[in-house]
Amino acid sequence: MLHTASRGCSRSWLRRLTALIAVSALAFVALPNVAVAANPMEYLDVSFGGTFAEDTYTTGGDEVARGSVTKHGSIPTKLDGGGITLAGGTNGVTFTSTASFSASGKVNKGFRAEMEYRTKQTPSNLATLFSAMGNIFVRANGSNLEYGFSTNPSGSTWNDYTKSVTLPSNNVKHIIQLTYLPGADGAASTLQLKVDGVAGETATSAAGELAAVSDSVGNKFGIGYEVNPASGAASRGLAGDVFRARVADSDAPWEILDASQLLHVNFNGTFSGTSYT
């Protein structure tokens, strides 16, 4: 009798388990589709460990270039340990992304860009550290580093929205980090800049204005080079060393950090024993 009761108990337990599995399966099938946020895209991340063949750069190691990297003028000189030296003037590097950042003559997709560089002498006036689509720029202007963008809302009237910080010193590596955010639904567009982790003022457009795109450079970025095709812009290259350049989605995390940024702690976390989180 004890043996028979045990068998009955086992069958009852098995029926309950089978029913539970069936209910769980139905519940899983009935779940609504849940949107999963896509990871931020990285379009360019190079330290110039690859090679230039003629005008085109071939990435090396784990470098990223979702598009083409091209030199203008002379072939950049490679530095021991990574990086290149740009001669300035009409020389520089451009990145043409396979992703679209513009439509109808406007930069309608935001992005982040980072560059680690060093100058050995004060840059010439309007020498360009970074540019995008022809009317987004970071450049020397006298004793200042000027950054901003130009808009052309009416098709005939140009508006410039710029801010500036003190020009970084020579013979020292510096990191610039910028974020362009196009205004949505009639809002203002913005360009934010940090130099070695210190943020400058935000360049902000009038409501509804987006950075303008110059002819044929809708998805083009300049590294130590001005991509604007106007004849006066062709000689605005930066003379200096570029160690790394990166372009990513506007919500991507920063990747190029100096010691001061890595060690920044405001102690809003917690201690567990001797460890801080």
Task: Annotate each PLM feature.
Residues 40-43, 52, 89-148, 184-186, ...:
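Extracellular glycan-recognition modules
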Residues 1-13:
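N-terminal secretory signal peptides that target proteins for export/translocation
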